[in-house]
Amino acid sequence: GKYTCGETCFKGKCYTPGCTCSYPICKKD
């Protein structure tokens, strides 16, 4: 996809579309 994951989760959520929290880092769905 056009989005890149890898930001830190914030309260278990990722704000980048298509990403989910794999604590502590957001990973692609």
Swiss-Prot record:
InterPro entries with a match to the protein in the record: Cyclotide, Cyclotide_sf
Domain of life of the native organism: Eukaryota
Any GO BP annotation: killing of cells of another organism
Keyword Disulfide bond applies: yes
Disulfide bond residue pairs: 5-19, 9-21, 14-26
PROSITE patterns: CYCLOTIDE (PS51052)
Record-listed cross-link Cyclopeptide (Gly-Asp), residues: 1-29
Post-translational modification: This is a cyclic peptide.
Pfam family, one: Cyclotide
UniProt keyword list: Cytolysis, Disulfide bond, Knottin, Plant defense
Family named by the database record: Belongs to the cyclotide family. Moebuis subfamily.
Domain observations: The presence of a 'disulfide through disulfide knot' structurally defines this protein as a knottin.
The protein's role, per its UniProt record: Probably participates in a plant defense mechanism (Potential). Binds to and induces leakage in phospholipd membranes, particularly ones containing 1-palmitoyl-2-oleophosphatidylethanolamine (POPE). In vitro, displays cytotoxicity against cultured cells but no hemolytic activity towards fresh erythrocytes. Not active against Gram-negative bacterium E.coli ATCC 25922 or Gram-positive bacterium S.aureus ATCC 25923 up to a concentration of 64 uM.
The protein's name in its UniProt record: Cyclotide mela-1
Annotated source species: Melicytus latifolius (Norfolk Island mahoe)
